[in-house]
A protein has these predicted regions:
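A polyanion-binding, active-site-adjacent surface
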Residues: 1-150
Length: 150
């Protein structure tokens, strides 16, 4: 269902300032599994858009606002329902992911998470850093937001 969207993400090359986690087909598939689960299990959607993937969360999992630690330790059905299908080569804890999903633990409705720029912006040559996306990167990100909504 999300194949075309995932393929568009995969088309974007990494650079000295941006890492594309969706070049890894396993990470791209994890995003697809997450989106399909949300679509299948909810009938109304709220899209919550963050800034960009962090190096310890979405850069590794492919799922916005989500770290491997969140996936492994959450009792939310979204994760208990999919975690055995996901590829996690590294388990990291990420502060924002922990705060967001802990808050949602007792909520009946979950948002669909996305980022204004879906790739990991980092300092030059340092993929273990986070930086805010540039205006041009946010403009680029609008394309992917529109594709996701379609």
């Amino acid at each position: 269902m999300f194949r075309d969207f995932i393929n568009k993400l995969n088309d974007r090359d990494s650079s000295d300032l941006v890492f594309n986690p969706y070049k890894d087909k396993r990470v791209a598939n994890d995003l697809k599994i997450y989106l399909e689960y949300i679509l299948k299990n909810q009938n109304n959607f709220v899209l919550l858009i963050g800034e960009a993937p962090g190096y310890a969360g979405c850069k590794i999992t492919g799922i916005p606002f989500t770290s491997g630690d969140t996936i492994n330790n959450s009792r939310l059905s979204v994760f208990t329902g999919i975690k055995n299908k996901l590829f996690l080569n590294t388990i990291e804890a990420e502060k924002t992911a922990t705060i967001v999903w802990d808050y949602l633990e007792n909520k009946k409705k979950l948002p669909v998470f996305w980022n204004s720029f879906p790739f990991h912006p980092h300092d030059i040559g340092d993929q273990l850093s986070n930086r805010a996306p540039s205006n041009d990167e946010i403009e680029e990100g609008k394309f992917y937001i529109k594709k996701l909504i379609e």
